[in-house]
Amino acid sequence: MGKVVGIDLGTTNSVVAVMEGGKPTVITNSEGQRTTPSVVAYTKKGDLLVGQIAKRQAVINPENTFYSVKRFIGRKTSEVTEALRQVPYKVLQTEDIIKLDCPALGKQFASEEISAQVLRKLADDATKYLGETVTQAVITVPAYFNDSQRQATKDAGKIAGLEVLRIINEPTAASLSYGLDKKDNETILVFDLGGGTFDVSILEVGDGVFEVLATSGDTRLGGDDFDEKIVQWLVNEFKNDEGIDLTQDNQALQRLTEAAEKAKVELSTLTQSSINLPFISVTPEGPKHLEKDLTRAKFEELCSDLIDRCKTPIQNALKDAELSPSSIDQNVLVGGSTRIPAVQELVEQLLGKKPNQSVNPDEVVAVGAAVQAGVLGGEVKDILLLDVTPLSLGVETLGGITTKITPRNTIIPTKKSETFSTAVDNQPNVEIHVLQGERELAKDNKSLGTFRLDGIAPAARGVPQIEVTFDIDANGILSVTAKDKATNKQQSITISGASNLAKDEVERMVEEAEQNAASDKEKSEQIDVKNKADSLCYQTKKQLEELSSKLEAADKEKVEEVLTKLELAVQNDDLEGMKTLSEELQKNMMEVGQKVYTPDAGAEGGAAPSQDDAIETDFSTEK
């Protein structure tokens, strides 16, 4: 069994980690960063961009840049009307399945396909770091994700070419990281406010046992919503000042979104942030600029309703765990949005103690996922994780009522059965409608699927005994079986189509991803070669400038000739030319370096530096 990685697939940023030498390690991506933006874009040429490089070009390519996709995964269009208004790309409704339109390619993507591109990049970065192909992962999801969203996340992993060994709740993963070395028993509350989702979990932690007592949350609340409040404020202010509605301009909206996120981050440490967006719009009179100062007090006023929404899940989790705030030993903050001072103050106010900020809120979830990956891979011993199902599961019964079979906060894996009967005489079959949620009426809960049990023996109503069994695995994914006790006939359903993607569609996406893997890798390598060549040109110019007084004219001319050719190759995307000329330029600069630093290198007894030494050295003038 190869290395199993832990992945935090976030709304705004994602992180991958692995167990090394018994300790979890966050893996740096190919750009040298520990977090990777969950952004995927396609250029006008059809090139795929993932991560920071995709985020950087979002302003000039908003219609083909996909972010915050986690808000759509496993959902139907009717469930995400608010989120649809917050993104500049087009979201299509096809048979109530969410599809993201990509004009650059002239095709549509499922949310799972976009998320798969992020997962594939994380897996590729992990492969480079470890020196072995990564094929297995533990992926985290918000604790309050329903069955559809969990299954959709597994589908995304499959499309990315990963075997998802376990889906684990984000707050639970955070607790694994926090409590890994804790010996004393503690009751902790994990407050996880990320880019797009919010969870609260209460756990008993100590001596290798992690037991979730209760979980609550809101999958429609996160940092994106705080950004949106600032965007709306800027739009309204600009409309009042200039009479121009910026919501009609996708590029302007993208610039506003990026400026809002920057201001939000600054207001975590400063009391005021200046927002300056020149040329945000153009009129016949000339260009218009947006200049506004946003104070922390105004920001908190704009977001007061969002901060208030953080209260209820805390109160619900305490109630379900049958605990008072004073029973909580530590409250651990997770997710980038917990850096907002008003959020920290709210948690302190509700629980009566300062939050524990000993963990990195951006990385702690991936680190915990790596610990769980280590458990599954046999690297980590003496860890017992007892997680729970976040929402009640049941069936629809007579009168459109939801009858709960597995209450929320039931420890998983679990298997529970209830016996039902028929509603009319000689009823030949029953339809089992599986539901998830806390509402009394079936129509108000999430429908996970239906199936029919045929061949019930004729009998008066109320006589047949139909046993319905709910089986929830360690990933929180459900299977339901109905059995007629008289005839032993049974029918079952695994709620696996809940991601809204048919099995053959998932298989098609997997196949398509595999077919494109080679070309995607080739394009990635081309970009890498181009970036290195571009960097080499810059460094060479800089070194020529610094060494100009020490260089012979012929040597300088020789280097500049190759440099000009390499710059032209970069301009023309000439891959082979870039490779050959880069090698030639490095060789020439090495020779120059030898002459400058060891002028007697060729003389008797002189020792020339090795080629490796020459490449690794930064040329600089001695002062």
Curated annotation (Swiss-Prot):
One of its GO terms (molecular function) is ATP-dependent protein folding chaperone. Residues 598-623 are annotated as: Disordered. Keywords: ATP-binding, Chaperone, Chloroplast, Nucleotide-binding, Plastid. Its main location: plastid. GO terms for cellular component: chloroplast. It is found in: Plastid, Chloroplast. Pfam families: HSP70. Belongs to the heat shock protein 70 family. PANTHER family: HEAT SHOCK PROTEIN 70KDA. Acts as a chaperone. This is Chaperone protein dnaK.
